[in-house]
């Protein structure tokens, strides 16, 4: 038989569905299909292409061959990966507790350690009475209990037990820095406070803080050098120790130019026993401690070598200078700053280098037993919002030396705070109609000068009993045997220890004509409290004198060289 030949399609209407020249069936016109229509039709076709034998030639969405799902018969799949006996585990647990008692030590390769076996679980507060004494032993025929178990045998023992419990509760949930070494309470507290004295305690602000903590690898707590213990957040430190042990904390003594050099060095020695502490003066042009802080952050980046970049969060009280520190590190104004609290509203990311990012956080205040006057003098409340600013002036006169107030306001003598305000208003011309002194404006002037550092004031450091050796300054928490290794992490720890020790020997800048010679050179009581840790080979007067401007300029020049590469690497200096 002869096969019939197919007629050639000579009508000019191609029938293939993927032919771009085919006419659209919906329309009765002779228009051809567009390219987008042909691509859409090709997208609908997902069936595999097969040859005459049924073998798949090409398929876009399915694999051509099934992988071999058979598991190799290896005992490593079913055996123990790591085995340790109880003696080694107990020895390692003791060593871990010893090393981690210091905030200067770091756990390397924490993910490879059985932390659930090394950390002891907290004791359960609930008493399992049924496990200790079941019902059968307490009631029924098989009763074994002869007399009930009581907490105390008589009323005196019960009162003693209650007093011990109360003391333990107050010690655990105390006010923190305000209650330590301060005045004893009179048993009264403010039942109702104005909402302005609760600034920095809102749920939104605490949410911003915890976002910064969760996002940060290193947390820098900025504190005021004039009152370091008063501006510390012990609640935050306790939270980090309990729930964020893998995060590192640094204490930064900002505004060190407002206190004498001997006071700054004394606080460095005191606070360094708890956390790595650095002195800092925030200034874009003339800064102090910028090179040391950058070096410490670089060493922490070396410790976190498994991460592509690390984040450094700056937290602390309002108006302590967190945003100013970030601007100093970047050598440009990338964060909004103001001499009033509450300028930073939300957290923001700042790029320092390719491996280091900075996070600015709003100021957070932990609720404590501070009075309204303490809250105002810590810089938490804006002075312009105070209804009666004159009631806080008495505490300012008690804290500041009389000669400093005489030099600042040109007032020779006064009887009380009201008399001081009267003389200040008359001398400065703050008068109302009829020549009456404007006490409110005068009080706000004093509080503005207090918050902006124009009135000399500082809390002296406590006395230390430990005396350092002549050859070197001891940095607490650093084990020389542990850092003797030449590995990268050990070198980073050794570098951090060196930075801490060298800054304790540096001269700290102090504003000229701010303190008199007696305050700069220190009286005998302050010398006894701080010179016990000073080196025997150095002269006390040279250590305690204010540094010259040349020393500050040289430090700032070195800091500019240290971050010169950052400006070239990071073109985008705005916050994300």
Curated annotation (Swiss-Prot):
One of its GO terms (molecular function) is mRNA binding. Residues 16-34, 509-530 have a biased composition (Basic and acidic residues). Interacts with the 60S ribosomal proteins RPL10AA, RPL10AB and RPL10AC. This is Nuclear/nucleolar GTPase 2. Keywords: GTP-binding, Hydrolase, Nucleotide-binding, Nucleus. The gene is NUG2. Residues 206-367 form the CP-type G domain. The keyword rRNA processing does not apply. It comes from Arabidopsis thaliana (Mouse-ear cress).
